[in-house]
């Protein structure tokens, strides 16, 4: 599926692209000549591994003597895998991940201008290049992006007598009560370890909260966040969400939505390609701004993943890394990855990958220009992100929202 859109908002041309990823193969150790490298890719869906295997075959055919060993890892295991790589000094040459600044702080990775050519660097859209810097220097290589909006099932809404998607939290609760009477799950709320930080971040930013204050200091336990988590706990306890949000992952509720079992949820641009179309291309659903507490200002979560290149063997791997990364970022290769998966493009050249389906992607592009991102430029984010994934859901189960957030705040302050 190849769809892409180029949208212009706030003076920025945002190129959109779809991506496809797959399963894992074995990783290998570097050859002494530096011509064999290891690439660890995150699994986005079942298309991930086939894409990378084909691209690597093509790369090796065009670059005799160079070899890329591939390992594809599920997102649920990625954090622990990366932690082990670093602790055992077995990090790959190239890693597809959602963090980078802690590696930059510890001088483990190449700067962006050391990892790719000037042509590739210039191709990154400024919005994403700016999110890939540590202390004013770009280290992360923008890989894919996504924006989050509110998905709702029109058929379920019709049965519940609801004519429009909710704009405020009060409306979310009111609509959820009506949907519950139809027998459907009112609201999908994934606070399990896959991406709890994203789900909670969506709700908190739409209540004036966030991870840091205006000065950039950690503010995980700020009043707005406590209020947000208390609200989500209320919805859970009133049976207005799926059972056990604290153990439910994003992909679980996305699948249930695709099956027509959930009335509404915070969704992602890749939902249609990765979840809805494979199950029911005729599903009647709509996309709307994310609800906010007051129903007037609607913030969007922007998500960006990166490629990072680790320094190894005194820099002996750099030439092979350069060749492989420059090969991937060629327009035809990057566009094909994006069109396989359904993500938004981070480069100018891949901006037409979604043009055949502009109507679907336009709201996401428009939202992305003003989106709020996780503080990935703060090396402490890796620790905070991990703590949120493991702990935030306990607050809607049997924990206390304020105490849970205080605990995560302590982790943040310790991380720096």
Predicted regions and their residues:
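Long, aromatic- and glycine/proline-rich binding clefts that accommodate carbohydrate-like moieties
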Residues: 131, 288-289, 338-387
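Conserved N-terminal structural module of periplasmic/extracytoplasmic solute-binding proteins
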Residues: 3-102, 164, 292-295, 316-320, ...
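Conserved C-terminal helix/tail region of periplasmic/extracytoplasmic solute-binding proteins
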Residues: 158-159, 366-416
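Extracytoplasmic/periplasmic substrate-recognition and gating elements
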Residues: 57, 61, 160, 230, ...
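Extracytoplasmic/periplasmic solute-binding protein
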Residues: 139-143, 148, 170-219, 233, ...
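Glycine-centered hinge/linker elements that transmit conformational signals in sensory
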Residues: 176, 217-246
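Hinge/lid segment of periplasmic solute-binding proteins
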Residues: 98-149, 167, 173, 179, ...
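Extracytoplasmic "Venus flytrap"/periplasmic binding protein-like
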Residues: 58-126, 133, 158-160, 164-167, ...
């Amino acid at each position: 599926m190849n769809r892409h859109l180029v949208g212009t908002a706030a003076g920025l041309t945002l190129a959109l692209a779809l991506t496809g990823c797959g399963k894992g193969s074995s990783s290998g150790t570097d050859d002494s000549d530096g011509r064999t490298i290891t690439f660890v890719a995150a699994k986005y869906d079942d298309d991930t591994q086939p894409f990378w295997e084909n691209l690597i075959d093509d790369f090796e055919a065009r670059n005799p003597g160079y070899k890329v060993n591939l390992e594809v890892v599920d997102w649920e295991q990625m954090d622990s895998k990366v932690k082990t790589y670093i602790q055992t000094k077995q990090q790959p040459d190239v890693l597809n991940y959602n963090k980078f600044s802690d590696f930059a702080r510890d001088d483990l990775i190449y700067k962006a201008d050391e990892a790719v050519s000037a042509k590739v660097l210039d191709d990154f859209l400024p919005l994403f290049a700016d999110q890939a810097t540590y202390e004013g220097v770009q280290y992360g290589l923008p890989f894919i992006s996504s924006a989050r909006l509110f998905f709702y099932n029109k058929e379920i809404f019709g049965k519940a007598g609801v004519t429009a998607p909710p704009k405020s939290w009060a409306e979310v609760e009111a609509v959820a009560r009506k949907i519950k009477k139809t027998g459907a799950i009112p609201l999908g709320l994934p606070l399990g370890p896959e991406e709890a930080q994203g789900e909670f971040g969506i709700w908190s930013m739409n209540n004036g909260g966030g991870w840091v204050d205006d000065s950039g200091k950690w503010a995980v336990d700020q009043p707005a966040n406590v209020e947000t988590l208390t609200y989500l706990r209320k919805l859970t306890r009133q049976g207005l969400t799926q059972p056990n949000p604290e153990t439910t992952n994003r992909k679980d509720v996305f699948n249930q939505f695709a099956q027509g079992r959930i009335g509404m949820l915070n969704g992602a641009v890749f939902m249609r390609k990765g979840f809805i179309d494979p199950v029911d291309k005729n599903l009647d659903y709509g996309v709307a701004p994310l609800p906010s507490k007051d129903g007037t200002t609607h913030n969007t979560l922007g998500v960006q993943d990166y490629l990072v290149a680790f320094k190894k063997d005194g820099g002996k791997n750099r030439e092979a890394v350069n060749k492989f990364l420059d090969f991937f970022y060629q327009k035809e290769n990057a566009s094909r990855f994006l069109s396989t998966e359904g993500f938004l493009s981070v480069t100018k050249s891949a901006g037409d990958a979604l043009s055949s389906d502009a109507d679907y992607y336009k709201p996401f592009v428009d939202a992305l220009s003003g989106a709020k991102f996780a503080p990935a430029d703060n090396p402490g984010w890796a620790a905070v992100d991990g703590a949120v994934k493991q702990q935030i859901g306990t607050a809607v189960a049997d924990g206390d929202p304020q105490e849970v957030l205080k605990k995560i705040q302590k982790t943040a302050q310790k991380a720096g």
